[in-house]
Structure formats: C-alpha cells, structure tokens
Amino acid sequence: MSETTARRDADAVLRARAEIDLAALRANVRALRERAPGAALMAVVKADAYGHGAIPCARAAVAAGATWLGTATPQEALALRAAEPGLPDDVRIMCWLWTPGGPWREAVEARLDVSVSAMWAMEEVTGAARAAGVPARVQLKADTGLGRGGCQPGADWERLVGAALRAEEEGLLRVTGLWSHFACADEPGHPSIAAQLTRFREMTAYAEQRGLRPEVRHIANSPATLTLPDAHFDLVRPGIAMYGVSPSPEIGTPADFGLRPVMTLAASLALVKQVPGGHGVSYGHHYTTPGETTLGLVPLGYADGIPRHASSSGPVLVDGKWRTVAGRIAMDQFVVDLGGDRPEPGAEAVLFGPGDRGEPTAEDWAQAAGTIAYEIVTRIGSRVPRVYVNE
C-alpha cells in the first residue's frame, strides 16, 4: 500500500468507521450451531455480508464451523470462490438469484451450487454443464407459500423434477439440494409457518419418490433456526442472526439467543459550535433550537446509508449521553443538539453498536426510521471503512 493510500484510508477512518467484531461473529455462529445440533450450517453472506464485508465474515464463519456459504447473486459467489487466500476446498458455496443469460458456465466450473426454480434455468444450466464438460451442482427451489422465488407445487414441480432426473441420467448435473424459504417465520404462531412446512415435506417427498437423492433439504432462515426445531432438516441458513441482530423484536432480543451485534457504527464530530435559541437547523428548518445550545456535526448522511426517515428521531451517543438527530439528515452529514455540553471536535459519536456501553442499537435506528434492523446494517455504504477487530 502506498503512503498516499494509507493516509487516505486513515483519514476516512477518522471521519467515520464501521467496526466489525469478528470474535462476536464467530461466537454467534457457534451459538446458532448449538440451536440446530443435527444440521449443517450455511452462513449467508449475501449483500456483502449484510454490509459487514463478505470475505472477512465468510472466513470467520467457516472458522466457527460453517460448512456452507450462501449468496444471492452468482457474482457474489464467484467472488468468494476467487478470494485469496482461498477458502477451504470443502466449503460449499450456493447462489440463488439468477436471471436468463447469467454466468452459468462460470458457476459450474467454479463448483458452485446453483438454485433452479424454472424450466428456463434448467435448460441454461444443463447447457452450461454440457459446454463445460462438468456436471452442475443444482438445488431445486420450491415455492411453499412465500409467493416469490421457487417453483410452484403441482404440475410445474413435477416437470422440473422430471427434467432434473433426465439431466442426472445424462450426467449433466447432480441435484444436491431441495429447498424453500419462509414468509412469516419471524411472526411466532403465524399459520403460514405450519402450512409451509407441510408443503415442503410434500414437495421433497415427491422428488425423492421420483428418484432424486439430495444431500440437503433446507428451509430454515434466521428466525426458524432460532425458534423452529422442526424446520431444521439437514441444513440451516441463518443470515441476520449471524451478525448478532434479532430477526424481529417479537421473537426476542439478540441476548435472548446468546447473540452479540457485530457492527458498531461511529463517527468523529466534524464541528461543535454555540448557537442562540430560535436557530433553524438543517434543510427546511424542521428543527429550531429551543434555547441557546451547542450543535455537533456528524459527518455521515444518507449517501453513507443513514436513513433520511430517521431525521429528527435517530439516536446518537455523544460523551456518554443519548442525543437525537436535530432536523433533516443530509447527504453527507447531520446535526445533533448537545444541550449545554461542549465536547471537542473529533469526539466520538456512536450511532449504533451492541448496546452494552450505553449506545443505541441497530434496532433503535430501525424504530426511528420505521424499518427493520436488516436494512440499517445492510445499507451502510462503501464510503464508510470497515475496520475488523478480533480477527
């Protein structure tokens, strides 16, 4: 690394940083494995590991016992396979979000497990396998009630299973898995949970009766891994829980499951100044100071993933006290009213973290923005350096 690059990176960290605690991630993976002792674990690292950094988090998860990695796009999966130093050869990597004309041949040659939900995808992956001269690893996805990706039950599923059997006989592919995804596993007692489990059992049983012999059957996402033992089957694939965030306040806090949030988002105050009462703050003057006060400028904005919907409501810890965003969050910055306190420029402002030092959590920001904690951590942008600790 050149001196100029090192200085630029150091300056960026001084402005703002997302600290990623890899020891917490490893502990979370171990806690999740204990929740599903009879199943293998797929660490879902899609969307740059929910904003935490895919390759460092993948390595940490594998070190803690994950034997599979999951991504949405094939590009994410190919990047994992190409990482240097490489992941262990026996770690399986699956990707599931395909569009026509995707990099099927590259995926086959990289030994990825690819999801197939429709006949067009079956035709493309078998064509890629024929061209590569290598059997594809295919997982058939069933729509058991989510109404999103996956093959519909009935005639569509029967055709897809039949096509997979014929391709296996030709040596073009191996069906390594049958899988699905829950719609409402984060809502305890929702009737769709039992209905989807029943449908999943029916659809996998049909495929196996026809002659498919998958290595794994899986449907358990984070909430199902944590609360639904009947859904664990051969493999669980937690995503958000691996990063120490609860899938939903309704099922419990991270601490209830022995999980610890992995990301801490902090910045250094760029400016601290005194203003009189009645002073408008930020665009539109949606906040006016109630009296003489101190304002602190936090150099993070919606370009960095701070949700504009949290204007006038997002919590921030400064000098040991919770403060609230004053007025609108702008593209690169927002303001907090510090009352009578006068911290020095450069003082730390913590937006969220585990919460055990008094700081807000990602869930607090989700409540302030009217969204879910998944979005809070995942949307933190590339302008914010990731700083890995406890590697």
Curated annotation (Swiss-Prot):
Keyword annotations of the record: Isomerase, Pyridoxal phosphate
SUPFAM superfamilies per UniProt: Alanine racemase C-terminal domain-like (SSF50621), PLP-binding barrel (SSF51419)
Gene3D superfamilies per the UniProt record, alphabetical: Alanine racemase, Lyase, Ornithine Decarboxylase, Chain A, domain 1
Binding residues for substrate: R148, M331
UniProt family annotation: Belongs to the alanine racemase family.
N6-(pyridoxal phosphate)lysine carried by residues: K46
One of the record's GO molecular function terms: pyridoxal phosphate binding
Any one of the GO CC terms: cytosol
Function (record text): Catalyzes the interconversion of L-alanine and D-alanine. May also act on other amino acids.
Gene it is expressed from: alr
Keyword check for Hydrolase: no
Listed transmembrane segments: none
E.C. number: 5.1.1.1
Organism (species): Streptomyces coelicolor (strain ATCC BAA-471 / A3(2) / M145)
Catalytic activity: L-alanine = D-alanine
UniProt cross-references to InterPro entries, sorted A to Z: Ala_racemase (IPR000821), Ala_racemase/Decarboxylase_C (IPR009006), Ala_racemase_C (IPR011079), Ala_racemase_N (IPR001608), Ala_racemase_pyridoxalP-BS (IPR020622), PLP-binding_barrel (IPR029066)
Pathway: Amino-acid biosynthesis; D-alanine biosynthesis; D-alanine from L-alanine: step 1/1
Cofactor needs: pyridoxal 5'-phosphate
Protein name: Alanine racemase
Active site, renumbered: K46 (proton acceptor), Y283 (proton acceptor)
Listed SMART domains: Ala_racemase_C
BP GO annotations: D-alanine biosynthetic process; peptidoglycan biosynthetic process
KW Isomerase (keyword) present: yes
